[in-house]
Protein backbone atom coordinates (compact mmCIF):
# COMPACT_ATOMS: atom_id res chain seq x y z
CA UNK A 1 0.00 0.00 0.00
CA UNK A 2 1.21 3.50 -0.81
CA UNK A 3 2.81 5.49 2.02
CA UNK A 4 1.05 8.67 0.96
CA UNK A 5 -2.25 6.83 0.53
CA UNK A 6 -2.06 5.48 4.10
CA UNK A 7 -1.77 8.94 5.68
CA UNK A 8 -5.09 10.31 7.01
CA UNK A 9 -6.33 13.73 5.90
CA UNK A 10 -7.05 16.08 8.80
CA UNK A 11 -10.39 17.82 8.29
CA UNK A 12 -10.79 21.27 9.92
CA UNK A 13 -14.07 21.88 11.81
CA UNK A 14 -15.35 24.39 9.20
CA UNK A 15 -15.01 21.89 6.31
CA UNK A 16 -17.80 19.50 5.34
CA UNK A 17 -17.16 16.44 3.15
CA UNK A 18 -20.03 14.56 1.51
CA UNK A 19 -19.72 11.39 -0.56
CA UNK A 20 -22.29 10.29 -3.15
CA UNK A 21 -21.17 7.18 -5.01
CA UNK A 22 -17.78 8.07 -6.53
CA UNK A 23 -18.28 11.84 -6.19
CA UNK A 24 -16.60 13.68 -3.31
CA UNK A 25 -17.91 17.15 -2.45
CA UNK A 26 -15.88 19.40 -0.12
CA UNK A 27 -17.36 22.64 1.23
CA UNK A 28 -15.55 25.27 3.27
CA UNK A 29 -15.13 29.02 3.84
CA UNK A 30 -13.41 29.62 0.45
CA UNK A 31 -15.90 27.72 -1.68
CA UNK A 32 -17.11 24.31 -2.78
CA UNK A 33 -15.24 21.71 -4.85
CA UNK A 34 -16.43 18.47 -6.40
CA UNK A 35 -14.40 15.62 -7.91
CA UNK A 36 -14.90 12.05 -9.11
CA UNK A 37 -12.61 9.54 -7.40
CA UNK A 38 -11.65 6.21 -9.02
CA UNK A 39 -14.22 3.41 -8.62
CA UNK A 40 -11.63 1.10 -7.02
CA UNK A 41 -11.02 3.49 -4.09
CA UNK A 42 -13.35 4.68 -1.34
CA UNK A 43 -13.22 7.60 1.08
CA UNK A 44 -14.05 7.01 4.75
CA UNK A 45 -14.70 10.07 6.96
CA UNK A 46 -14.59 9.66 10.75
CA UNK A 47 -13.56 11.71 13.85
CA UNK A 48 -12.37 14.74 11.85
CA UNK A 49 -10.16 12.59 9.59
CA UNK A 50 -10.58 11.18 6.11
CA UNK A 51 -8.87 7.98 4.98
CA UNK A 52 -8.64 6.56 1.45
CA UNK A 53 -9.09 2.78 1.24
CA UNK A 54 -9.13 0.19 -1.53
CA UNK A 55 -12.61 -0.86 -2.60
CA UNK A 56 -11.35 -4.33 -3.60
CA UNK A 57 -8.16 -6.35 -3.64
CA UNK A 58 -7.10 -5.68 -7.23
CA UNK A 59 -3.88 -3.83 -8.01
CA UNK A 60 -5.36 -0.76 -9.79
CA UNK A 61 -6.97 0.22 -6.48
CA UNK A 62 -3.58 0.28 -4.79
CA UNK A 63 -2.06 2.32 -7.61
CA UNK A 64 -4.66 5.08 -7.21
CA UNK A 65 -4.53 5.45 -3.40
CA UNK A 66 -1.75 8.06 -3.22
CA UNK A 67 -3.18 10.11 -6.08
CA UNK A 68 -6.71 10.07 -4.65
CA UNK A 69 -5.47 11.01 -1.17
CA UNK A 70 -3.46 13.94 -2.54
CA UNK A 71 -6.38 15.18 -4.67
CA UNK A 72 -8.78 15.12 -1.69
CA UNK A 73 -6.16 16.77 0.57
CA UNK A 74 -5.73 19.54 -2.04
CA UNK A 75 -9.51 20.02 -2.08
CA UNK A 76 -9.55 20.42 1.73
CA UNK A 77 -6.61 22.88 1.59
CA UNK A 78 -8.27 24.78 -1.24
CA UNK A 79 -11.56 25.40 0.57
CA UNK A 80 -9.75 26.46 3.77
CA UNK A 81 -6.61 28.39 2.68
CA UNK A 82 -6.91 28.58 -1.10
CA UNK A 83 -4.10 28.45 -3.66
CA UNK A 84 -2.09 31.22 -5.27
CA UNK A 85 0.25 31.50 -8.25
CA UNK A 86 2.33 34.62 -9.00
CA UNK A 87 3.46 35.70 -12.46
CA UNK A 88 6.01 38.35 -13.49
CA UNK A 89 6.15 40.27 -16.78
CA UNK A 90 9.72 40.94 -17.97
CA UNK A 91 10.40 43.14 -20.98
CA UNK A 92 10.27 46.75 -22.13
CA UNK A 93 6.65 47.90 -22.35
CA UNK A 94 5.22 44.63 -21.02
CA UNK A 95 2.42 45.49 -18.60
CA UNK A 96 -0.84 44.14 -17.23
CA UNK A 97 -4.04 45.74 -15.94
CA UNK A 98 -7.56 44.72 -14.98
CA UNK A 99 -10.69 46.01 -16.71
CA UNK A 100 -13.49 44.69 -14.54
CA UNK A 101 -12.72 40.95 -14.32
CA UNK A 102 -10.84 40.91 -17.64
CA UNK A 103 -7.02 40.84 -17.61
CA UNK A 104 -5.55 43.06 -20.34
CA UNK A 105 -1.84 42.67 -21.14
CA UNK A 106 0.52 44.51 -23.47
CA UNK A 107 3.08 41.88 -24.51
CA UNK A 108 4.80 43.34 -27.57
CA UNK A 109 2.15 42.30 -30.07
CA UNK A 110 0.32 44.76 -32.33
CA UNK A 111 -2.76 44.32 -30.13
CA UNK A 112 -3.43 44.00 -26.39
CA UNK A 113 -3.99 40.44 -25.16
CA UNK A 114 -7.23 40.01 -23.20
CA UNK A 115 -8.07 37.08 -20.92
CA UNK A 116 -11.35 36.43 -19.11
CA UNK A 117 -10.69 34.10 -16.12
CA UNK A 118 -13.14 31.36 -15.03
CA UNK A 119 -15.81 32.42 -12.51
CA UNK A 120 -14.13 30.84 -9.46
CA UNK A 121 -10.65 32.28 -10.17
CA UNK A 122 -9.65 35.70 -8.85
CA UNK A 123 -6.93 37.74 -10.58
CA UNK A 124 -5.16 40.67 -8.95
CA UNK A 125 -2.61 43.08 -10.48
CA UNK A 126 -0.72 44.81 -7.60
CA UNK A 127 1.89 46.29 -10.00
CA UNK A 128 1.96 46.60 -13.79
CA UNK A 129 4.51 43.77 -14.02
CA UNK A 130 2.96 41.37 -11.44
CA UNK A 131 -0.12 39.16 -11.69
CA UNK A 132 -1.54 37.17 -8.76
CA UNK A 133 -3.96 34.29 -9.47
CA UNK A 134 -6.02 32.89 -6.57
CA UNK A 135 -8.64 30.18 -6.24
CA UNK A 136 -9.79 27.13 -4.30
CA UNK A 137 -9.02 24.56 -7.02
CA UNK A 138 -5.25 23.96 -7.28
CA UNK A 139 -5.50 22.41 -10.73
CA UNK A 140 -7.54 25.31 -12.14
CA UNK A 141 -5.21 27.96 -10.62
CA UNK A 142 -2.23 26.23 -12.24
CA UNK A 143 -4.04 25.89 -15.57
CA UNK A 144 -4.97 29.61 -15.64
CA UNK A 145 -1.37 30.58 -14.76
CA UNK A 146 -0.04 28.34 -17.54
CA UNK A 147 -2.55 29.81 -20.02
CA UNK A 148 -1.50 33.39 -19.18
CA UNK A 149 2.19 32.40 -19.40
CA UNK A 150 1.56 30.84 -22.83
CA UNK A 151 0.54 34.23 -24.30
CA UNK A 152 4.25 35.19 -24.29
CA UNK A 153 6.56 32.50 -22.90
CA UNK A 154 10.02 33.74 -21.86
CA UNK A 155 12.33 33.73 -24.87
CA UNK A 156 15.82 32.22 -24.48
CA UNK A 157 17.98 35.21 -25.55
CA UNK A 158 16.86 38.07 -23.30
CA UNK A 159 14.32 36.30 -21.09
CA UNK A 160 11.46 38.62 -22.08
CA UNK A 161 7.95 37.32 -21.51
CA UNK A 162 5.59 36.11 -18.79
CA UNK A 163 7.23 33.86 -16.19
CA UNK A 164 6.32 32.31 -12.86
CA UNK A 165 7.69 34.17 -9.85
CA UNK A 166 11.17 32.88 -9.09
CA UNK A 167 11.45 30.94 -12.37
CA UNK A 168 15.00 30.89 -13.73
CA UNK A 169 15.34 31.15 -17.51
CA UNK A 170 18.54 29.73 -19.04
CA UNK A 171 19.74 32.30 -21.54
CA UNK A 172 21.54 31.42 -24.78
CA UNK A 173 24.68 33.22 -25.96
CA UNK A 174 23.37 34.47 -29.30
CA UNK A 175 25.47 35.26 -32.38
CA UNK A 176 28.18 37.31 -30.63
CA UNK A 177 31.10 35.19 -31.90
CA UNK A 178 30.30 35.49 -35.62
CA UNK A 179 33.31 36.69 -37.75
CA UNK A 180 33.00 39.13 -40.62
CA UNK A 181 34.77 38.25 -43.89
Swiss-Prot record:
GO terms for cellular component: cytosolic large ribosomal subunit. One of its GO terms (molecular function) is rRNA binding. It holds the Pfam family Ribosomal_L6. SUPFAM superfamilies: Ribosomal protein L6. It comes from the Bacteria. Keywords: Ribonucleoprotein, Ribosomal protein, RNA-binding, rRNA-binding. Part of the 50S ribosomal subunit. NCBIfam families: L6_bact. Belongs to the universal ribosomal protein uL6 family. HAMAP family: Ribosomal_uL6_B. This protein binds to the 23S rRNA, and is important in its secondary structure. It is located near the subunit interface in the base of the L7/L12 stalk, and near the tRNA binding site of the peptidyltransferase center. This is Large ribosomal subunit protein uL6.
Amino acid sequence: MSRIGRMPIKIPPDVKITIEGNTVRVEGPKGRLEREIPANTKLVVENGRAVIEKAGEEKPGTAMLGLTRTLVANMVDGVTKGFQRNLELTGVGYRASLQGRKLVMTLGYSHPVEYEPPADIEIEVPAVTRIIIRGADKEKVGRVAAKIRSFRSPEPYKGKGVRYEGEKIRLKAGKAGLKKR
